[in-house]
């Protein structure tokens, strides 16, 4: 329930706005299912954060979702966040999946974590076509793939 105090705070404080570009990468057919996740954050068109991480034993969808969760977590509470992603699955899982989460819902742990973070922020999604020349999407794609390749190399015997 929105209170008068909430309305006053929302109208008198300029919210910070962020554009977050995210990507995940994984070889779902590999025995180790190595992957990588990456995000890049812009505030007023200026890059303020860029991170990536290697993910062992993951899936492509989980890597995409982890990248989004990491970007949302970076942004301050009460900020307005636009997530730019090429993952239709992640958008569907985070934005559309309204049913009660149970253990049989794939990636329910990540959906729950996203919901907890997003409840404190104003998050929206923009789908971008992957590998189509979007500058920032190409950057995070390269970052996620680099982490995937590093993980793959580190697991070689």
Per-region residue spans from a language model:
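RNase H catalytic domain
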Residues: 19-31, 69-143, 147-148, 152-154
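RNase H-like nuclease fold core
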Residues: 2-62, 66, 73-75, 142, ...
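N-terminal hydrophobic targeting segments
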Residues: 1-2, 131
